[in-house]
Swiss-Prot record:
<keyword id="KW-1133">Transmembrane helix</keyword>
<keyword id="KW-0150">Chloroplast</keyword>
<feature type="transmembrane region" description="Helical">
    <location>
        <begin position="221"/>
        <end position="241"/>
    </location>
</feature>
<protein>
    <recommendedName>
        <fullName>ATP synthase subunit a, chloroplastic</fullName>
    </recommendedName>
</protein>
<dbReference type="InterPro" id="IPR000568">
    <property type="entry name" value="ATP_synth_F0_asu"/>
</dbReference>
<keyword id="KW-0406">Ion transport</keyword>
<dbReference type="InterPro" id="IPR035908">
    <property type="entry name" value="F0_ATP_A_sf"/>
</dbReference>
<dbReference type="GO" id="GO:0045259">
    <property type="term" value="C:proton-transporting ATP synthase complex"/>
</dbReference>
<dbReference type="GO" id="GO:0009535">
    <property type="term" value="C:chloroplast thylakoid membrane"/>
</dbReference>
<keyword id="KW-0472">Membrane</keyword>
<keyword id="KW-0066">ATP synthesis</keyword>
<dbReference type="GO" id="GO:0005886">
    <property type="term" value="C:plasma membrane"/>
</dbReference>
<dbReference type="GO" id="GO:0046933">
    <property type="term" value="F:proton-transporting ATP synthase activity, rotational mechanism"/>
</dbReference>
<feature type="transmembrane region" description="Helical">
    <location>
        <begin position="38"/>
        <end position="58"/>
    </location>
</feature>
<feature type="transmembrane region" description="Helical">
    <location>
        <begin position="200"/>
        <end position="220"/>
    </location>
</feature>
<comment type="subunit">
    <text>F-type ATPases have 2 components, CF(1) - the catalytic core - and CF(0) - the membrane proton channel. CF(1) has five subunits: alpha(3), beta(3), gamma(1), delta(1), epsilon(1). CF(0) has four main subunits: a, b, b' and c.</text>
</comment>
<keyword id="KW-0793">Thylakoid</keyword>
Length: 248
């Protein structure tokens, strides 16, 4: 079995996913590139919300925390515990910012699709939507995760990291290699599919029935959106921890 062509085909499949389109989209032409404006606009809003809220709340820490400071400390503690559980007490520290950034961006992005008024910014085509309902965003989040667990394993074990591919037997070499190359594909599709499906269901219900009827579905969507952010962050941390511990 030839491993290299399979790995190349897997990477090519991830690249080809960037051309997937669902519904109407609004594009900007920047130089020779076509940029998905809906994703960029909502992503900038999400980043502004995260940076703005963090700056306002923690720029002047109090000995007796305010409600906002308490909330951010709770979020940080939650992310730290999640990272520690998946990576291990000795190694988790440097990875808290990475896992925290992934979790918070995905969480707020997922919720933005349901909470941000879709007509808050008028676009020539289409409407604002969650950045994570676009495959380009989820691939862009999954690829750094892949780089992170390769980096974690190599920095911890050196070239000996690649010995895991022939464990427990060399005959599993092709499968073990493909497993690592398909992880970003799995992360991308899981997040993209769930968020897109949730938004499509809400849009269909809103167009077919009165406004109050889809509200329970919207609340369910908020719950599942939070769960998807947690799953992505947990898997990212688990992959990093696995790469430093060895093959399981």
């Amino acid at each position: 079995m030839s491993v290299l062509p399979c790995s190349i085909n897997t990477l090519k499949g991830i690249y080809d996913l960037s051309g997937v389109e669902v519904g109407q989209h609004f594009y900007w032409q920047i130089g020779g590139f076509q940029v998905h404006a809906q994703v960029l606009i909502t992503s900038w809003v999400v980043i502004a919300i995260l940076l703005g809220s963090a700056t306002i709340v923690v720029r002047n820490p109090q000995t007796i925390p305010t409600d906002g400071q308490n909330f951010f400390e709770y979020v940080l503690e939650f992310i730290r515990d999640l990272t520690k559980t998946q990576i291990g007490e000795e190694e988790y520290g440097p990875w808290v910012p990475f896992i925290g950034t992934m979790f918070l961006f995905i969480f707020v992005s997922n919720w933005s699709g349901a909470l941000l008024p879709r007509k808050i910014i008028e676009l020539p085509q289409g409407e604002l939507a969650a950045p994570t309902n676009d495959i380009n965003t989820t691939v862009a989040l999954a690829l750094p995760t892949s780089v992170a667990y390769f980096y974690a394993g190599i920095s911890k074990k050196g070239l000996g990291y690649f010995g895991k591919y022939i464990q427990p037997t060399p005959i599993l070499l092709p499968i073990n290699i493909l497993e690592d190359f398909t992880k970003p594909l799995s992360l991308s599709f899981r997040l993209f599919g769930n968020i897109l499906a949730d938004e499509l269901v809400v849009v269909v219900l809103v167009s077919l029935v009165p406004s109050l009827v889809p509200i329970p579905v919207m609340f369910l969507g908020l719950f599942t959106s939070g769960i998807q952010a947690l799953i992505f962050a947990t898997l990212a941390a688990a992959y990093i921890g696995e790469s430093m511990e060895g093959h399981h």
